[in-house]
From Swiss-Prot:
Regions crossing the membrane: 1-21, 27-47, 48-68, 91-111, 141-161
Its EC number(s): 7.1.1.2
The entry's keywords: Electron transport, Membrane, Mitochondrion, NAD, Respiratory chain, Translocase, Transmembrane, Transmembrane helix, Transport, Ubiquinone
Bridged cysteine pairs (disulfide): none
Primary localisation category: mitochondrion
MF GO annotations: NADH dehydrogenase (ubiquinone) activity
Family named by the database record: Belongs to the complex I subunit 6 family.
Protein name, UniProt field: NADH-ubiquinone oxidoreductase chain 6
Length: 173
């Protein structure tokens, strides 16, 4: 289990690196999906299964729609892949910054494999993520409404920004 969590953390970092190296949106979405699956798997291994499932469903339901729009509007005849020199240069630079951060920060505790699970005492224990669901819907109604309106406003702002010369989303390719 320890090596599995280490593998998930490595996949999470590599997925973030795949997005941050700035390839075409066609390839950047693959890195985001990899990072999302690894992060939700990491939460799942810690025992927070419901929150992991909700985060994954929200990600697939919401964020991939934004990437469909960005891929449709990008319409590059020659998209930049991960093998292009500029993208490889960004990736090498980010790995260099990561290595320098580990060297300057020290390796104390980095190689100490061990995972403490949440609520592993038995069947009679109340899971923290399940009791948190009631708090989401009872105390968090106002925040959900504010977040929903914020996301709706963000959708309209992004659609207005990518509209381009009052022609809408349909462009001549």
């Amino acid at each position: 289990m320890t090596y599995f969590v280490f593998f998930l953390s490595l996949c999470f970092v590599l997925g973030g690196l795949a997005v941050a190296s700035n390839p075409s949106p066609y390839y950047g979405v693959v890195g985001l999906v990899l990072a999302s699956v690894a992060g939700c798997g990491w939460l799942l291994s810690l025992g927070v299964s419901f929150v992991s499932l909700v985060l994954f469903m929200v990600y697939l339901g919401g964020m991939l729609v934004v990437f469909v729009y960005s891929v449709a509007l990008a319409a590059d005849p020659f998209p930049e892949a991960w093998g292009d020199w500029r993208v490889v240069g960004y990736g090498v630079g980010f790995v260099g910054v990561l290595v320098m951060g580990l060297v300057v920060g020290g390796f104390i505790g980095c190689l100490n494999f061990g995972v403490i699970t949440v609520d592993s005492t038995g069947m009679l224990s109340v899971r923290l993520d399940f009791s948190g669901v009631a708090m989401f819907y009872s105390r968090g109604v106002g925040m959900f409404l504010v977040a929903g309106w914020g996301l709706l406003l963000t959708l309209f702002v992004v659609l207005e920004l990518v509209r381009g010369l009052s022609r809408g989303a349909i462009r001549a390719v």
